């Protein structure tokens, strides 16, 4: 039995960084990600690579007004204990010149028009399933909105990636009930399967990028409660400048993981963000 390579990209622009840093500090990364997408698509076409682009629902909109027309009713929007996580509140702050960091309908069309590329979901609002204060009902409303705005633009969503890989069984059942057939589950190792990450764990994650402290990570996919868990194996992390001289080790590690999956008929799931 041949091994399987899965590639997924978290297509989110600035929506995934709202609680991390101000736009002006990250804008160049986001705009660089926009420029990288056509180049990635050209490479994918050249080498016959199929990929799933897990897309934040807000990106389908051509304006804040269009996005707002798909908002769930107020009671069904996320009530996070930490208000910085609530991307619905961000729309009043988006200026005309900021739009390329928040909306991307033309890029979605470009991806969808490229052979072998699937438009998946990264939730409507970059929703956090394990943060305190929100509920499964609010998540269901958010995902229904994601499906609705995608459908308006001609896309049927069947694959999902939950932001920051915050997977919860009750929320996965919501995905199944909404017609999703697969999701990217959390990596099955002691370094990655944590929701909140402290500094020592970040160091271990970085180390695992270059050295196999968590092993190969390949697996046989399983269908659980009627939906396929295609869990991640390795994030293709961006270049860390102080360790740039070790990039060869990072690539070598990924190649070894891919080879192990190929030789043993297993699945290897590589993922990243376009702005990486």
Language-model regions, residue ranges each:
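Short, intrinsically disordered, charge-balanced linker/junction segments flanking boundaries
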Residues: 274-276
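Catalytic alpha-helical scaffold of carbohydrate-active enzymes acting on polysaccharides/glycoconjugates
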Residues: 1-159, 164-230, 246-272
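Positively charged, amphipathic and often flexible ligand-engagement surfaces
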Residues: 233-236
């Amino acid at each position: 039995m041949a091994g399987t390579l899965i590639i997924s990209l978290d297509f989110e622009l600035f929506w995934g960084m709202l609680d991390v840093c101000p736009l002006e500090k990250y804008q160049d990364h986001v705009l660089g990600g926009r420029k990288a997408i056509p180049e990635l698509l050209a490479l994918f076409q050249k080498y016959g690579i199929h990929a799933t682009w897990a897309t934040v629902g807000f990106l389908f909109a051509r304006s804040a007004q269009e996005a707002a027309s798909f908002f769930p009713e107020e009671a069904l929007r996320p009530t996070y204990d930490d208000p910085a996580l609530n991307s619905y509140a961000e729309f009043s702050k988006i200026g005309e010149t900021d739009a390329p960091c928040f909306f991307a309908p033309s890029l979605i069309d470009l991806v969808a028009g490229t052979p072998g590329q699937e438009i998946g979901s990264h939730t409507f609002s970059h929703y956090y399933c394990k943060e305190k204060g929100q509920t499964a009902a609010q998540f269901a409303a958010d995902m229904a909105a994601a499906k609705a705005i995608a459908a308006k633009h001609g896309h049927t969503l069947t694959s999902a990636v939950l932001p920051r890989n915050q997977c919860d069984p009750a929320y996965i059942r919501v995905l199944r009930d909404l017609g999703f057939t697969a999701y990217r589950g959390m990596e099955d190792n002691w370094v990655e399967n944590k929701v909140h990450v402290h500094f020592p764990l970040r160091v271990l994650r970085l180390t695992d990028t270059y050295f196999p402290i968590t092993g190969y990570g390949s697996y046989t996919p399983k269908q659980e409660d009627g939906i396929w868990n295609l869990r991640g194996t390795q994030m293709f992390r961006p270049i860390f400048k102080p360790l740039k001289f070790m990039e060869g080790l990072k690539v070598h590690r990924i190649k070894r993981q891919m080879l192990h999956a190929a030789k043993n008929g297993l699945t290897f799931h590589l993922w990243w963000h376009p702005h990486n």
